[in-house]
Amino acid sequence: LNKGKCTEILACYEPAFRFMAEWWKQLYGESEGKNGIGIFPASLEYTADLHSMGQYVQDGPRKLYETVVSFEKSLTSFAVPFGMGDPDGLNYLAGRDLHDICRTARDAVKAAHISGGVPNIGVSVDKRDEAGYAELVCFFELACAISGYMSGVNPFDQPGVEAYKKNMFKMLGKPGA
């Protein structure tokens, strides 16, 4: 099923996606991490993590694969301004839309990671709005249930969580614990 991969990285080029990625890690960690098996869920926020973690993904051990979430349409528009004297060396981007620049970064990183041997799955939704997030929740919950059953675990229980909660409640003196 996982072809020797033990880590799935969920990546997105949208900072506002951070908390959705945290939800995704909880969903997959609680649902699949059982009986000594399961793929470790991790997340990266590109482009912020590209220079640090991008190096690891590109040239590190080949025990991971990447799922990249993309929003095809931006909710806002921002054109890169022209800087007098080109102080940051970015005038070649002047007038270009930030969403288009991020899309180009996504495509360039995907090509590099694939050529470097990192399997890459793309998940695309129209916009980062309520409907887009609802599509992602439905997709990931269904995918998680299917992959859990295919791995031979019940994706709907959490015995590991119950074990630490039981210990914590007892240590804190919760009545009946």
Task: Indicate where each model-derived feature is located.
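A SIS-like phosphosugar-recognition module
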Residues: 1-177
